[in-house]
Amino acid sequence: MGSRKECAENRKTFEKREPERYREAVPSLLFWYDYNARILPWREDPTPYHVWISEIMLQQTRVEAVRAYYDRFLTELPDVQSVAEASEDRLVKLWEGLGYYSRVRNIAKAAKVLCDKHNGQLPADYALLRELPGIGDYTAGAIASIAFGIPVPAVDGNVLRVFARVTGYRGDIRSDSFKKQVGEQLRQAISAYTEEQNEKSRGKCAEEKTIPGAPVAHPTKVQSAPGRFNQAVMDLGATVCIPNGKPHCEDCPLSHLCAAFGEDLTAEIPAKTEKKARPVEKRTVLVITDGERVLLHRRPAKGLLAGMWEFPGVVGELSPAAAKKAAAGILRRESEEKGLHAKRLPDSRHVFSHVEWEMRGYRIDVPETIAPGAEYSWATPREIREERGVASAFRTYRDLILKGI
């Protein structure tokens, strides 16, 4: 790991072409990873199923948040067949709190495809993996390389940031052209390294066979090199070449190759893009209870929080009188509005990727059990705790119910 001055001099001396930077990055990262890999539960036994579930969970979700969910999911559903046979409510309950629930629904769809077409096994083929519901380029690359040792890249935001800095790229790293460029360069670099190491291993095996009684070499690390490389870039981007704040260039195994480090541009690369402000939506949440049970509403099958259970509500901030009127309408008992009691609950806020909800809550007590419409269902606190997957946007009100408000 050289100084900035040394790196700048190196660039002036021989100005590496980009393919050379990518090729030199492979052995450097593999060596670094062998000593600095993060200890993560899904790396202990990286079967295709384990890699698949972990990679889907890790989409747009922090590593620390995934750990407990991963262990619980595998305990409940240890293989593809068990996922294919699980009910949607059970799957959503296991996913409760992770968000982006379309992910678990796609897992269920993919599991059924795997059972129907692939004997319940993930295929050792990038193109076939790419055809499965919920699996895009990155996830297919991660599964193919980590679980099967196939020399393909897994390109996500971490990878794009790392190689934007290494190559000195000043444009928008989210552009399709840059993603394509990085993906192709990494594919060539990983393939070349893997083939080179396999050639060396084959030559070593041939030499050892000439020695009577010599053991035959088994290049286990060579076979896993593509997966180790992709995980190395993930770890580098998460712990060293970080997105916000100052990257830890002094600890980076690629600093001798890095244009941004050599030219003191790590703060400018990748280029900052202006974030659009999320719209704020005011909502009123109605926790309607008949004494022992709470009324839940099933959201539509498409759209935000598709198919999830929620507490009924309306758009806008309602007064207590308006909240009682809204509850009476939901219960189809408009004429009995005066018999309802509305109690203010704490306000709550939830941030989605594209919108923020600011919620005002009311508890509405009804004097007797009323049969709700088809999209509604009464549930006890135990059922909410153990069986019904209530969207995490309503966690404040869910927790109040479980505490017996």
Feature map (PLM): residue ranges:
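Intrinsically disordered, low-complexity, charged terminal extensions of DNA damage-control enzymes
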Residues: 1-38, 44, 194-215, 219-221, ...
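Catalytic cores of DNA base-excision repair glycosylases
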Residues: 27-247, 257-259
